[in-house]
Amino acid sequence: MIIDGKLISQSLKDAMKIEVEALEQQYGRRPCLMVIIVGNNPASRSYVRGKIKATEYCGFDGHLVELPEDCTEEALLAEIERLNNDPAVDGILVQLPLPKHISEDNVIAAISAEKDVDGFHPENVARLWLNQHCILPCTPKGIIELLDQAGVEIAGKKAVVIGRSNIVGKPVSKLLLDRNATVTIAHSRTKDLAAVCREADILVAAVGRAKMVTAEYVKPGAAVIDVGINRTEEGKLVGDVDYDAVLPVAGAITPVPGGVGPMTITMLMRNTIECFLNRMGSATEA
């Protein structure tokens, strides 16, 4: 089975569109997402366009703040502070990567935790690991949603996550653990990686190496989630999984493009609604 992330994300966005109309009726305004981009990185610009397009589709207020490549860290932090203090703003996202002279850690920590739609703020990360209510990072959240929508059972299953990044590998392993999977985190130093992966009922590839996961890594019938986005020399987008080789072996697989990518943006929209509702709730209680 091919898990069609494009189709699933579209149906979720359609549902959110209706939800946003109801929220506007109830609260007198729509969720508002501010996206900040620094410089002219073409890949970043493409991602940002996709995010703004999704806000428009779902009926949010989505605004782009464009800052020059030579923008100082202080100027960026001042802009974040302005948005933190703006009651009309529900979500703030700074598109990564940033120019070398700006500290990503400082920028992520500067965004108010309650407006952190990426789920990267240290407070949200801590709350995830402490099993407390938090904004979840978009890609891991999207992966769980894809598995659920495809009817893949998680509880009691063996899951292997290849990759230990703070953005995907570690948080998705925690979400799988929370759903009662038995989780192994594998990485570049794992001995006999293929044998470890062959144990998995659910295999998540998030290493950033084109077509690294071949058929010998996959247990017949396993669900394979490909998080990788790699560009070949010919300019073609491919994942971390050798899709054509693994497709006949896997029970379910996400393609690249059209798998995890669309879900990441859709979960960003979901997180913006959550930030809006959290803020409206605390405003009502106050």
PLM feature segments, named:
Residues P31-G39:
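Short beta-strand segments enriched in small/hydrophobic residues
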Residues M1-G28:
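Positively charged, low-complexity intrinsically disordered leader regions
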Residues V94-I154:
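Anion-binding alpha/beta catalytic cores of soluble intermediary-metabolism enzymes, centered on
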Residues L96, V207, V227-G228:
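Glycine-rich, N-terminal phosphate-binding loop of Rossmann-like dinucleotide-binding domains
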Residues A75-P87:
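Short, well-structured alpha-helical segments in soluble
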Residues E104-V125, G228-M280:
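Rossmann-fold NAD(P)-binding glycine/threonine-rich loop
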Residues T55-E69, V183-I185:
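Short beta-strand elements in bilobed, periplasmic/extracellular small-molecule ligand-binding domains
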Residues V38-I52, C134-A223, T232, K236-L247:
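Glycine-rich phosphate/diphosphate-binding loop of Rossmann-like nucleotide-binding domains
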